[in-house]
């Protein structure tokens, strides 16, 4: 019986995202005075001299957050920006820059990725955001 309870307690599907974050980061302690709001909120708040910087990151996973059988890549690109800037906005901050990191399989053609980036570009234009870098792997 104890083994079954231990197995159930160890199942990701049994806890919320917030509970998971608390469990896996409980031994981390901030060492920098610049960290004002850390893990556990929608975004991090850092203070450098008199300047506040808010940082957020979200990941979208196919089959979990979107389904390409009915979501056009342009819409996915737009959504990928919105889900990230919404965390910044929820902290009452105007987003200004984004990094895009993408892991894409070789099943996609270059023009498909161009369509994805059309959506990213449209969201950036609509919200006056600069794309300043990121990481791409395939």
Write out the residue ranges for each language-model feature.
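Extreme N-terminal cap/leader segments of soluble proteins
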Residues: 1-72, 91, 100, 118-119, ...
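A glycine-rich phosphate/pyrophosphate-binding beta-strand-loop-alpha-helix module
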Residues: 2-3, 75-138
């Amino acid at each position: 019986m104890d083994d079954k309870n231990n197995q159930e307690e160890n199942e990701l599907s049994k806890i919320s995202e917030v509970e998971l974050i608390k469990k896996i980061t409980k031994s981390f302690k901030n060492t920098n005075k610049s960290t004002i709001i850390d893990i556990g909120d929608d975004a991090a708040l850092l203070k450098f001299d008199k300047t506040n910087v808010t940082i957020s990151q979200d990941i979208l996973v196919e089959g979990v957050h979107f389904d390409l059988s009915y979501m056009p890549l342009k819409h996915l690109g737009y959504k990928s920006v919105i889900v990230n800037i919404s965390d910044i906005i929820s902290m009452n901050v105007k987003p200004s820059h984004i990094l895009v990191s993408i892991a894409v399989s070789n099943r996609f053609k270059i023009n498909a990725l161009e369509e994805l980036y059309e959506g990213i570009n449209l969201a950036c234009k609509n919200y006056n955001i600069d794309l300043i870098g990121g990481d791409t792997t395939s």
